[in-house]
Amino acid sequence: MSDTNIILEVKNLKKTFDDHEVLKDINTTVKKGEVIAIIGPSGCGKSTFLRSLNLLEVPTSGHIIYEGNDLTEKGVDVDKLRQSIGMVFQHFNLFPNMTIKKNITLAPIQLGLMSKEEADSKAMELLKRVGLSDKADSYPDMLSGGQKQRVAIARALAMNPEIMLFDEPTSALDPEMVGEVLSIMKELAASGMTMIVVTHEMGFAREVSSRCMFINEGRIEEDSDPVSFFDTPKSARLKDFLSKVL
């Protein structure tokens, strides 16, 4: 990789389920500090693409190169990879039988990254950052959807990731809770975190992202800065899509 700022490179990525090709020869790069919004119609492959980046979906063929290492090669330490590439899911994926603090500290302690004391301290620091320091001893079912998603963000940050992946992080939330999650994501973006976000939030994509990517039928059909993407789209399919969602 010639550009020293490139943290992630995707080459000829394909993913097939049975005989259905979901991703068709995806090629892109991600630079450190970029915030990339991935937009597209349902079933276009955008979530499959995102999940491939930390091997939650194993590519059928192609290469994902993170900091010079090809993640598609045999013998890749997936646990180590997921420390570096954090993930926030649509449905939070918190452990219901654990307190909020335990949800955050579990992985760093189990993987030997921190002592219990260090992990507890980090969890409280992160809960303060997402505005939930008073919920450390609560359980997930005591929290609203927006609060659960803020905890999920804190949990991902506890691993000190280089990249954060967000898979439609607000789409399962009641409308009045969307803002509290987006504000945390905006703060993360402003802090320099590299973020790749599959989203239906066009305002976030326009205002916060440095790049917008339109995936359609398993291909990247448009990839540009937000102003060009929204104001002068080149792809006819993107123009049609935006006319329906804006």
Please state what every model-predicted region is.
Residues 214-217, 221-223, 227-246:
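C-terminal boundary and immediately downstream tail of ABC-type ATPase nucleotide-binding domains
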Residues 5-226:
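ABC family nucleotide-binding domain
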